[in-house]
């Protein structure tokens, strides 16, 4: 399997990307190199190798829940550059 410049142009169109002709050629070459590498991986003998689902044997390892005293409102706000009553005051971000 190989990728053509027509394939790259089609994928770029779907992704709403614009490439120059040089970029399109480079993308075509790079994608073909990747596919060639994947084809090489298909040649590897994996007979007797168990499929790997994760890279380690630990599943859902979570930290222990430790109860602690939360910050008071004053402690939380003491380094705030701006505040209003007991709330952080931030600049408007939606016009």
Curated annotation (Swiss-Prot):
TM annotation in the entry: none
Pfam families on file: GatC
Keywords per UniProt: ATP-binding, Ligase, Nucleotide-binding, Protein biosynthesis
Enzyme Commission (EC) number: 6.3.5.-
InterPro entries membership: Asp/Glu-ADT_sf_sub_c, GatC
Example GO molecular function: asparaginyl-tRNA synthase (glutamine-hydrolyzing) activity
Highest rank taxon of the organism: Bacteria
GO biological process: glutaminyl-tRNAGln biosynthesis via transamidation; regulation of translational fidelity; translation
Reactions that this protein is recorded to catalyse: L-glutamyl-tRNA(Gln) + L-glutamine + ATP + H2O = L-glutaminyl-tRNA(Gln) + L-glutamate + ADP + phosphate + H(+); L-aspartyl-tRNA(Asn) + L-glutamine + ATP + H2O = L-asparaginyl-tRNA(Asn) + L-glutamate + ADP + phosphate + 2 H(+)
Family: Belongs to the GatC family.
Reported function: Allows the formation of correctly charged Asn-tRNA(Asn) or Gln-tRNA(Gln) through the transamidation of misacylated Asp-tRNA(Asn) or Glu-tRNA(Gln) in organisms which lack either or both of asparaginyl-tRNA or glutaminyl-tRNA synthetases. The reaction takes place in the presence of glutamine and ATP through an activated phospho-Asp-tRNA(Asn) or phospho-Glu-tRNA(Gln).
Quaternary context: Heterotrimer of A, B and C subunits.
Protein name per its UniProtKB record: Aspartyl/glutamyl-tRNA(Asn/Gln) amidotransferase subunit C
Organism: Chlorobaculum parvum (strain DSM 263 / NCIMB 8327)
Underlying gene: gatC
